[in-house]
Amino acid sequence: MKKVRVTISDFMNEIIKSDSEYFKMPVGRIGNIIFKYYMDKNLNKVELGNFSGEVLQFNLNKNNEEIFMDTFVRSGVETEAEYWRNIIFTYINNLRYKREEILFEKIFRKIKEGMESKRKIKIKYHKYIRLVSPYFVKVADDENRSYLFCYCEKNNDYRNYRISEIEEVWFTNENIEKKDKKYIDDVYKNFDPFLSYKNTVKVEFTEKGVELYEKVLTNRPKLLDKKDGIYTFECDNKLAMVYFAQFFSNVKILEPSELKERLKNELKKTIKIYENEEEKDV
């Protein structure tokens, strides 16, 4: 088994390690994928410079090991280390969603084939097999990653699934069903991972809550209206739980009622955890 050991800049190493964590993929697998992806493509050239950098090492898989020497020689690059740095440099010079397309090329390709053939596909997502009608793949701007928007037969509802967490895709002979074309088009135009379109949440902030709202930008829902201290957001319940839960007592959920109940139940569970801790300490 051939071991790759190459010194790269701190910046290059940081992006590789970040992608490994973000996409839950070992560094070695990333290295094998990008070698195969770039073996027949032009590479950007990079100079390491007069500094030590970081050492990246992993093993080539059997298939890549068999083709590596021929590919390296044909590249015309003087050393293997330089060749690997060029591959990595070319890879990291893509935006994250483009790097995702490289790492999960097979999944993207199969989904695209399913959509083009207008057939349902089966996907393995979080260990479960789901039959879905795939409508489109869209990048979530806030996350810089791609989602498959589809109708899921298992949930009998529209769903967004992270492409990077789809483990496998299978084709079927069943035709795609478009139950509500207008809704699908509207979701495409107003896309967000939580499918907030047409869903609303009303809240009331304390003075401190307003200050937090103005500062906390990550996952902040779209503001539709603000009147008499009441804020109305375009927001799905899932997004509301993610965003507003961090405000604790500085926000009051007014609508919808099911969100209020869910948040109350979660807070009760949290209180119970701390009460149990206090009982143990007595």
Predicted regions and their residues:
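Intrinsic-disorder/low-complexity, polar/charged segments enriched in Ser/Thr/Lys/Arg/Asp/Glu/Gln
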Residues: K3, V55, K120, T200, ...
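Short Lys/Arg-rich basic patches
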Residues: M1-F11, D40-N64
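Surface-exposed, Lys/Arg-rich phosphate-binding patches that contact polyanionic backbones
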Residues: S9-R29, N63-E82, N86
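Intrinsically disordered, low-complexity basic tails/linkers immediately adjacent to helix-turn-helix/homeobox/MYB/SANT
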Residues: N50-F68, I107, I111, E116-K118
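Polybasic (Lys/Arg-rich)
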Residues: D192-V282
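Core beta-strand-centered patch of the WYL/Sm-like small regulatory domain
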Residues: N93-V201
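Short, basic amphipathic alpha-helical segments that act as recognition/interaction helices
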Residues: K24-E47, E78-E101
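Generic structural detector for well-ordered beta-strands
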Residues: R5-T7, Q57-N59, L131, E204, ...
